[in-house]
Amino acid sequence: MFDLISFIFGDPENKNFLKQAKKTVAKINELEAQYTVLSDADLPAKTGEFKRALAAGTSPEKIVPQAFALVKNAARRLVGREVSVCSIPQKWDMVHFDVQLVAGLALWRNMVAEVSTGEGKTLIATLPAYMNALFGRGCYIATVNEYLAKRDSQWMGALYNMLGLSCAYVYANQSDDDKKRAYAADITYGTSSEFGFDYLRDNSSTSEISDKVQRGFFYCLIDEADSILIDEARTPLIISGEDEDAGANPFSDLLAPIERIVDSQQKLCAQLAEKFRRAERENALTDENFNDLYKIYSCSPRNRQLLQILKNGGVRKRFERLKLNMAADCNKVLAHELKNGMYYAANEKNKTATFTELGQNFFGGSMFLVNDIEADIKSILRDKSMDAPRKNDAVRAKQRQFAESTDRVFALNKLLQAYTLYEKNVDYIVKDGKVEIIDPNTGRVMEGRRWNDYLHQAVEAKERVNIESENTTYATISIQNFFKMFEKIAGMTATAMSEADEFREIYGMKAVRIPPNKPCIRKQLPDLIYLTRREKFNAIIDEIVRAKAVGQPVLAVTASVDDSEVLSRMLKIRHIPHNKLNATNDELEAGIIARAGQMGTVTISTNMAGRGTDIKLGKGVEELGGLLVIGAEHCQSVRVDRQLAGRCARQGDRGAVRFFASFEDTLFRVYADVSFLKDSIKQKHIEGAAFSSSLFPSIIAAAQKKAEDLNFSARKELLKLDAPVNTHRNIVYSMRDNIMSAEKLGYALLPLLDAEIASCVDTNLPANDMDISQDAVSKFCNALFCDYSLSILPMELDGLPKNEIRRKLNEKVAALFEKGPFAKEKGGRGLVLYVLDKAFRDHLSRLEFLREAVYLRAYGQRDPQQEFAQEAYKSWCGLQRTFARSLIALSGRAGIDN
């Protein structure tokens, strides 16, 4: 097999690694043969021997062949033995193939290994996991769902236990004690999100530092690395709670007006569409008619009447040309004028919706006029006819009025977004009275996740379900920055090479393609492209019926829950029994997917349901051509298409895959340029017949590249914007650890408080020590009491230079932290942590708002990322000052109480 490597894999780096791996594999197999003379009881002793050698400074590279050989030998000894996996007894039948050893070596060297589906990634993981566990610093294995974490930890746990290592898994709602024990195991399985949330929870706790459940970040092996490190990386991990400062919910009161404007817009679109059809029937189409189409498109890209009109190839070609013209700088004024003829504009690609001037006037233009709050407050403060209390009341009233106005405008915009760009059963489902988000890549419901920035509340209002309080962010971290905390990370996936650049650029990991154990004989059938979704779905049903007639099993995979429901209904009409998976129960779906290869079985599934589960062919299926996988549309990523194809033809089995597509699919509609084919399509289109053109593969590839580039840019943008937040989070969590572990709380806090005390001294006392009078000291002591509740007598500071005053204040504050509420070990630290956490929460809220608003500065020719970094730094300085002032004030009040 290795002799074919250089022929199959041309990449020099890939080839060089495989050449070296070939020699190491030969050595591993030689050692494994020698280990057959050992008894089962000798294996844990061998593990202990490896641990001692590493602790004594032996090079890990010398241990690797021996360690891998021992793992392979343990797997061989388990063959035929029964292992309980998720309460189901299974006979062990796995011993590492040579290519699995190669993959293990890649993972040991912190690479991303491209391992074809069905090649045994679960068993491969045992090799680097065992080797890294020998260091005694913990080893995490991240999976895509809790079922796989439980299954793999119990399944592979038999192997680890034979070698003398412990293995456990973590899951949501697990008790802290159980979780701590799981993390203390040599090898810990879990989902990436659970690992991340446990990190955030550990650093939000006010209990002892020893109560943290995690024990550090040494090595993490990521199964399905593309899904975790790329797809999930677009959504940061967030722990949130109810916003204590949240005002009244404005959404319910605004539902009626927003529905009126949406209804008015739909009627206007219908009128423009009918006007176009009338001109089309009379062969009198003009530029004005196409401008009307552009108006409809600009406010409602998914408008059904528009999509129906664009089925005419000639019309579509002319319209595509118009869209290109409107994107040019010279036509921006015209494009703006056309959009202003509608009530609002919506951009499907960017998920943005804005009211036009006409739309603002619909509500009464004054609703969108927000006064300059700063100018109003300055005017109040300059008003000599008002005393201080009245000025304070007037300022607060003006601030309330401003907040109510901006909240109302903000809520209107969020409702517009919810009504125009977020579709039920495509972007979300409503289940048990709750709006639940659908992951666009996997088709899974994202349990517990909520859209931020009040969008989720807007969708809840739209669906007339209970509107939950807007939460404030307590702690957050991006997937990228969480995994960057590990000293070593590695990953496996069937599609690593597709994202090799991103793995290298973001995570510093090389990607390497591992050859399959047996040649893949998957049959890639040509795509079938249709004009409409209706024709496409009919063709898919016909294909399923043909396969079902001969007993060939079919797995039809859709991009959304809505599409899976459509296919399911159509199959019921044709009386075709089938299983339907909407990716809501990992364990149930794994069982159904595993049986999808049985003769005559038809399974409808969303993109990633049952991922990580092998589909084994039933008796007689091989002769029928194996499993037929149908893709109901091309995904935005070629990588996800490849994952879908990988459902069949595993381990040398036969199998076939075919994609169906239509010009109404998202990929074609949003990302593909097919305008140059419109004349041909118009002439050749026959209802229900597929188009054939050698250009379609390149059109689809270009569209996917365009979508992938946009998504990659979004992930890079998230990482850049998260950089200052990541720095601030690390500092805050380090501060928390110091506070929780310090012997003397006051003196541990002094470095944090000194800058504020120095600022107070410099602000309230003359610059020259010779100018500090008794009157100045008296006023300074008064300021200390007013600003910080810090009680100190002027006579204590009389005659002292500023640096001595500063030192004395530091000592005074530090001493106060040993009294009153702070004298209680847990209570005092808990109080300080509460103040720090509150300041950090407010900081995160400011940054969240800033992240949404900073891109507006691009219109002023300013770099949004640079602007964000500058504003984030200002907010961080504010956090430090707020924390220090609050602590000094707390210490002052403690002194007064005593």
Regions found by a protein language model. Give the residues of each.
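Conserved P-loop NTPase motor core
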Residues: M1-E687, S734, P751
